[in-house]
């Protein structure tokens, strides 16, 4: 059930260049949310619109959220300190489908945040990509307690496989009998991941990152085309069957 929470900030730490990890003491939100869902955060009274942020972790009653400072709203959010309280609406949207077997998580950039929550929930390996060793280092540390095996690619080849996650994906898929592929990141990356997964007849779910205003399906600002017509990322997603959106 969607609720409005006013919760204390436990930490708001910078973990990489322009990337922050926000930790909230929110046991009820943690208990009722599912991997792949998101929240709408009210930055302050000075901002009319909330900011949609994916839920990255829900362990021990704490909700963790990763965000990149890209504008005035997230810049102000990065200045919020432990001990203050945050207005959060959630959990919103439809998350990943519960399933058994070994799942492969494939992500890049901030798209790795909702996949971290999936790694806490499912038995999973992760294939993660970034620009360089520094960008992927903190993600590897976050996934280590939850993922059985971590595969890495970097654009500059400084660590892991040189190239993109789609370059490494065929070899990773050949290593094990995965039951499904879950992916989140840039749309062009997800399209490539979905193509390779579906060629192997593997179920594939994609999680879209879209700008949105209301987060409740009223404003239509986050609508996308699917084989079933226009759908709202905030309400019908953000997780979709890849066959429905990349037909």
Question: What name fits each language-model region?
Answer:
Residues 1-3, 230-247:
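Short, basic/aromatic-enriched C-terminal tail that caps enzymatic domains
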Residues 2-84, 131:
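Ferredoxin-reductase
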Residues 47-56, 93-101, 234:
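Short, Lys/Arg- and Gly-enriched loop/turn segments at beta-strand edges
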Residues 75-208:
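FNR/FR-type flavoprotein reductase catalytic core
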Residues 114, 187-188, 209-238:
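Local cysteine-cluster metal-coordination motifs and their immediate loop/turn environment
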């Amino acid at each position: 059930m969607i609720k409005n929470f006013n919760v204390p900030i436990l930490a708001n730490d910078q973990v990489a260049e322009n990337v922050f990890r926000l930790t909230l003491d929110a046991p009820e939100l943690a208990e009722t949310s599912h991997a792949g869902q998101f929240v709408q955060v009210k930055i302050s009274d000075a901002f009319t619109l909330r900011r949609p942020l994916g839920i990255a972790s829900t362990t021990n009653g704490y909700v963790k959220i990763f965000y990149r400072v890209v504008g005035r709203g997230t810049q102000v959010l990065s200045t919020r300190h432990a001990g203050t309280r945050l207005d959060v609406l959630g959990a919103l949207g439809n998350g990943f489908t519960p399933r058994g077997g070994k799942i492969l998580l494939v992500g890049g950039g901030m798209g790795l945040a909702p996949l971290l929550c999936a790694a806490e929930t499912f038995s999973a390996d992760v294939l993660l990509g970034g620009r360089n060793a520094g960008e992927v280092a903190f993600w590897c540390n976050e996934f280590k307690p939850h993922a059985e095996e971590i595969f890495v690619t970097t654009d500059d080849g400084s660590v892991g496989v040189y190239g993109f996650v789609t370059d490494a994906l065929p070899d990773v898929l050949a290593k094990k009998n995965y039951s499904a592929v879950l992916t989140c990141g840039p749309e062009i990356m997800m399209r490539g991941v979905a193509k390779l997964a579906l060629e192997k007849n593997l179920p594939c779910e994609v999680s879209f990152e879209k700008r949105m205003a209301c987060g409740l399906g009223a404003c239509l600002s986050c609508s996308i085309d699917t084989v079933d017509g226009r759908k709202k990322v905030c309400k019908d997603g953000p997780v979709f069957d890849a066959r429905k959106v990349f037909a």
